[in-house]
Amino acid sequence: MKFRPLGIAKEIIQAAGMQVTYTYDDLVFIEHSPVIVQFDDENKKNLKVYFNVDCETAAAEKIEKKLKDAATEREFTITITGEFEMAQKRGVEEIEIRLLPY
């Protein structure tokens, strides 16, 4: 199991006005799903961000600025890596997530 700086990631996300709802492996899920944060295993001081395909451009720009400002205060960086889609799987209580890198 790899060490990932979840505490600092949570601080950055909360400072940007959002709440962590769930973590799974290298992914951090945010309340209302405007973004998914992924730990960068190649650069421990970087967090990769994927925007929900349904997130409006103006909202995405505000979120990006808040995340980058909060990360900089903690000597971290944010890399906007792509978008993601979420869909309910048929017949089961599972969600499928597709990361769509730029």
Q: Could you describe each region identified by the protein language model?
A:
Residues 15-23, 77-81:
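Short secondary-structure junctions
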Residues 10, 15, 33-36, 60:
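Intrinsically disordered, low-complexity regions
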Residues 42-102:
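C-terminal basic regulatory modules in eukaryotic proteins
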Residues 4-20, 71:
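Amphipathic alpha-helical segments
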Residues 19-38:
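Ser/Thr-rich, low-complexity intrinsically disordered terminal regions
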Residues 1-8, 59-63:
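Short amphipathic alpha-helical segments
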Residues 12, 37, 66-70:
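Generic hydrophobic, helix-prone segments enriched in Leu/Val/Ile
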